[in-house]
Design a protein with these regions (language model features):
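N-terminal signal-anchor transmembrane alpha helix of single-pass membrane proteins
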Residues: 1-40
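N-terminal topogenic membrane-targeting module
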Residues: 24-115, 125
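Structural detector for internal amphipathic alpha-helices that build alpha-solenoid repeat scaffolds
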Residues: 79, 87-97, 119-131, 156-166, ...
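Amphipathic alpha-helical repeat scaffolds
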Residues: 47, 51, 78, 107-111, ...
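Amphipathic alpha-helical scaffolding segments comprising HEAT/armadillo-like alpha-solenoid repeats
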Residues: 61-66, 97-110, 133-146, 167-179, ...
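Positions within ordered alpha-helical repeat solenoids
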Residues: 48-56, 83, 127-130, 164-167, ...
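Short inter-helical turns and helix N-cap capping residues of alpha-solenoid HEAT/ARM repeat scaffolds
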Residues: 113-115, 150-152, 182-185, 215-217
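Long, contiguous interaction/recruitment modules in multidomain scaffold/adaptor proteins
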Residues: 23, 147-148, 155-156, 160-188, ...
Length: 225
């Protein structure tokens, strides 16, 4: 009799665990679907905002900046920009300059956030080449601070953003800084890819050759490879 009660109790516990797991999985999937639909809605809203020229509507501009204080919204906004860039490249080129300058307002906010969130902002700056439209005195201090960060993700995205600025002197300053702090050097592929994609490489290469003998072997190998 006792054995039967133990077996029955064990069976009930097992069934209960299975039901709880099933319920948890259903809730998780429902939540995931809701979040996905919400992100899709935000993405479409941001896409429309971009196409309507955000900078011409100060109320919308203020609301957007406030929303982009959230890193998840920032990444959703970047997804919207990516869609516009790929589907309507002309409209993207017409609007990206004003949006880039608007994004400068996020720097003081993200400076107080975690390293990963700071890196996300630098990543968005880099992939859309926003830094070439932004005020150097605002964006460069932020990026150079990230370049000296202990987080590799911060350093790599900061360097990408500096490359995308098309500012030769900023790139040379970044490479010189990394050479003087070899422990901060990102993967050599990041260094090489940045040089290959740099729009003003014809002007940059002579400066690099002039400086090459002063660089440490590690930096020399990274640049020459």
């Amino acid at each position: 009799m006792i054995a039967q009660l133990v077996i029955a109790f064990y069976f009930i516990v097992c069934v209960g665990i299975i039901l709880i797991n099933c319920f948890t999985e259903i809730i998780s999937r429902c939540r995931s679907c809701v979040l996905k639909r919400r992100e899709q809605r935000y993405c479409e809203e941001y896409r429309q905002l971009f196409l309507e020229n955000i900078a011409e509507n100060k109320k919308q501009e203020k609301r957007l900046v406030k929303e982009l204080h959230s890193t998840s919204r920032l990444l959703t906004f970047s997804e919207a920009l990516y869609k516009v860039e790929n589907s309507m490249p002309e409209q993207f080129q017409q609007g990206i300059a004003s949006v880039s300058r608007l994004m400068e307002e996020l720097i003081p906010v993200y400076e107080r956030k975690s390293d990963m969130e700071k890196a996300c902002l630098a990543y968005v700056f880099a992939i859309f080449h926003m830094t070439k439209f932004q005020a150097k005195e605002i964006v460069f201090p932020f990026l150079f601070d990230l370049l000296g960060n202990k987080s590799l993700y911060c350093r790599e995205n900061a360097l990408r953003a500096l490359y995308s600025s098309e500012d030769i002197h900023a790139v040379m300053q970044a490479l010189t800084f990394l050479d003087a702090n070899e422990q901060l050097l990102p993967h050599e592929k990041i260094l090489a890819d940045g040089l290959l994609s740099f729009d003003k490489k014809e002007e940059l290469i002579p400066l690099l050759w002039k400086k090459m003998s002063e660089f440490h072997p590690t930096m020399q190998v990274s640049l020459l490879d």
